[in-house]
Amino acid sequence: MCKILCSTGALIGLPNNRNYKLLKPLSKELLCDGFEFMMYSSWYDKTDEITGFLQDTGLYTPVMHCEKHIGEAISKNETDEALCLFKINCNMAQEINASKLVIHLWDGITSDQNFQNNLRLYKELEEISNSYGLCLLVENVVCNAGNPMKHWLELAECYPGINFVFDTKMAAFHQQLELLYSEEYKWLWQDGHIKHYHINDYAGGYMEWEKLRSLPLGAGNIDFKKFFSFIHKVKYNDTFTIEATAFNQNGEVDTDMLNRCFENVRHYLKEI
């Protein structure tokens, strides 16, 4: 059965001082089926505190999103740092009973400019995540040299068992959403490589960096009716995460907006 998750990154950010303890009261207002826990770089000195908090609150967190600087370190060939941080993220995911671990295999200004670094290190990352009982998912992160679907293909050629998380916003940014439905990329769903989806809208054109924001469904130009028709066609029946930024500059969280997103996804899933 499909589960609709909320990214904790949609709730917790700099405007509310990345106060993870807000998750307890906010979770009571949200009509999602669980959460995708987003790790931040400022939390490495309190990992035990955070995992203990999540265990005590009993939040259902089947997915964890790695801290994004790991991908940047990989891109810069800072291998030791990347692996050290990745192991910390894996341990946290195991502690909060997540089964899926999302990673930005490339990130930052360096992005995919040195993609051979990212390609080479994947094998070790997968081995580490497997040792923690986690399914590692590589996201179709935006690029400033190549494009994510091309890199997915390169990764799959080297590592046939690789798994992915598909982000609708990231795909729309590169005008690659249609590739998901194409004959060229049908191997992604025929062979079950996509294990998770990030559902975000996008209101820009091709690679409009200033418009690269996580928007709620309906606030951009993505055809979600077509997307969910595809989801039905390929019989995908697993997890989705809503990531639309819900906090304002004062740190106040618009839970009503997120609940509308959850309801919209449920409507699409029932309608088809």
Where are these regions (language model features)?
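N-terminal pre-domain/capping segments
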Residues: 1-88, 94, 130, 163, ...
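Histidine-acidic metal/acid-base catalytic patches
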Residues: 1-8, 17-28, 97, 124, ...
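Short loop/turn segments at strand-loop or loop-helix junctions that form parts
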Residues: 9, 65-69, 103-107, 201, ...
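Acidic-and-aromatic substrate-binding clefts and catalytic sites of carbohydrate-active enzymes
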Residues: 11-18, 36-49, 70-80, 108-113, ...
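Residue-level detector of anion-binding/catalytic polar loops
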Residues: 33, 60, 99, 135, ...
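Conserved beta-strand positions in the central sheet of alpha/beta enzyme cores
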Residues: 36, 63, 102, 137, ...
